[in-house]
C-alpha cells in the first residue's frame, strides 16, 4: 500500500476490547476487519505502528460513549488524528437488524471515508473535570431526595404523621428527633434512615463548596459570572450550563445552541401538510433541565431583586442591558402565552428556548482564554 494514502480506522470501543476495521481513502477500496485488540496503551501503540506501516495519514474514529475521551487525547500524541462521533446521528439502513462489533467497526470506517459522520465537541481536560464535579452534585441531590422519600415512606407505613407546615425545616427536624417507633427493630430502621439523610446532606454541602472553590480558577469562570446577570440563572444553573456546553460562542447562531439543547419543536412535514410537535429533547439533558428550572423565574413581573442587583454590580453595562432586555421580553412573553391558554410547562420551555439566546449574547461579550 502506498505510503501517501489516508486510512480511516473504525473502532468499536468497549471496556476491555476494541474491534478495529480500516479502509483506504480510494473510492471502491474494500473495508478490512483487523480484529479485536486490548485497551491498554501498549495495545494502542502496537495498532498505530501497524497502521503507520500502511499509510502516513491515519484517522481513527469511534463513537462517544461510557469509555470517555482518553483515546481522543492519546492518539494525537502518536501523530494520528482522532474523531469522536455522535452515535445517535450515525446513518442506519431501516432493514438492518444485525449488530456486531465487527459490523460496527467496519461501518464506522466506511462512513468516515464517505463523510457521513457527525463529530462531537470534546471538552478540554479541565472543562471535563468541572463537568464531573457538577454532575456529582446532581447525583448527590438525587441521592438525598431518594433518602428523604424512603424515610417519609417508612413513617407513612407506621402511620406516624407530621402535622406541621413544611418538611425538612427546623421544626420538622426537631419533630423527627422525638419520634418513637412501635418496636426496637423499627426504631433502628428509622435511625438508619435519619443518618442516611444527614450523610447525603453533608455530602451535597461538601460538593457544592468544592464546586464553588474550583470554579474560581476555571478559565470559563468569567462566563459563569456573566450568565448570572440573568434572572433565574444563579451559580448552579450558570455553572451547569457552561460545564455541559463549554464555550457557548462555538455556536454560530443562538438557534444552533437551541437545537443542540433539544429545545426546538419536532416536525413532520409531508407535501403541503406541516406538523410540529413537542421539543426534540435531543442533546444534553443536564443543561436542558437546568435551563428550564431557571426559566420558571420569568412567570413573575420584570423586577431587579436585591440578589440580582448584587450580581449585576460587578458586570459591564452592556451585560446589564442584555439582562434587563431579557427580563422585559421573557416576562411579557410568559404572560402572553399563559393568557392564550398554554399550559405552564409548555410556556416555561418556550421561555427557556429564548433564554438560551440571551445567554449566547452575553457569552459573546466575555473574552475566554483558549
What are the roles of these predicted feature ranges?
Residues 1-370:
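A detector of single, family-specific signature residues
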